[in-house]
Structure formats: structure tokens, C-alpha cells
């Protein structure tokens, strides 16, 4: 599944139908994207390694911004509402996404407050904002 999405640099706005697909549209002129980007860094006295599924960078009037998108293939549980599913995904992956934010802030010199965190939920084609 990751291979399919990592092949997409940008999706044309007219082809983006679902919330997940809309996250693959270039947000602004000059935006750049990392896809399946591995990293290693020494932070807080320990080595840390990971891999970003997708990171989008752009600038606005206040400076550089970034959005970390992580694909999740979890399924909705029997009887679970979409809102409950999104809440469960946010809770399950919050720690991982906060670690990604801290790593990206260090690697790209972007304040953590300017880094968005989104889970791209493949099974529902939805998006869950973390924090």
C-alpha cells in the first residue's frame, strides 16, 4: 500500500475526490515533498531512527511550515463510528506522530508549532488531525 502512495508526488486537484486524496494535492506554489524518507539523529541523549511516509514543506508570510502525513491501514471495528475510529487512531498513534514532529523540527529547523500532523486513513479514505 505504501508503495502505491509513495509513487504520488502530487495529485491533480481535479482527481482528488476523498479527504485522503486531497492531502496529496500541492498546497501552495513552491511546496516540496519528501516521500518515504528515512532519518537518523541523536536527540535527548539517544539515537533515534524512523521513516516519514510523507512530509510537505511550504512557506507562508510567517516562514516555513510542514505537514507530516502518515498512512494507516487499520480497519474500522465492527459497529465503530467513523468519529470513534478517528479518535482511536489519534490516540493509538499520537506518540509516534509527536516523535516525528520532534525529529522533523530538529532535522529541518522548523518550530514544532508550525508542523501539522495528519493520519491518512486508507480504509476509509479519511484524515485524522493529531493534536
Question: What name fits each language-model region?
Answer:
Residues 41-98, 102-104:
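Non-catalytic protein-protein interaction segments used by genome-maintenance enzymes to assemble
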Residues 1-44:
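A non-catalytic, helix-rich entry segment at domain boundaries
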Residues 67, 73, 109-131:
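Substrate-binding beta-hairpin/strand module that engages nucleic acids
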Residues 24-26, 108-111:
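A general structural signal for short secondary-structure junctions and capping/turn motifs
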